[in-house]
Amino acid sequence: MKGIKFFYITCPKKKEAHKIASFLVKKKLVACANIINNVDSIFSWKGKVTKAKEILIVGKTMNKNVQKIIKSVKKLHIYEVPCVIFFDFKNGNTDFLKWIIKSV
């Protein structure tokens, strides 16, 4: 099914992840958001290799909402440059994919 996206957002704190995920679901920008604790992240930031425990938000949405999600996350997130990435769905449970489309 065309237009369905999987998204990936990282947060420094569980409370922030819940705030962002709840906002996106309430605004019907995403059909579903899953929060995964204790992700070990290693990244380059301002010339230094940095290690951090992060919280991961993953979920499902439609292409029509991508820019609204990015804008919302940038407003709500404490990171200067938050990670907000989208991937296309190739296939999946058709009933679940239809539910995503109806939910957003």
What are these regions (language model features)?
Residues 1-104:
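Positively charged, small/polar-rich N-terminal and surface patches that mediate targeting and assembly
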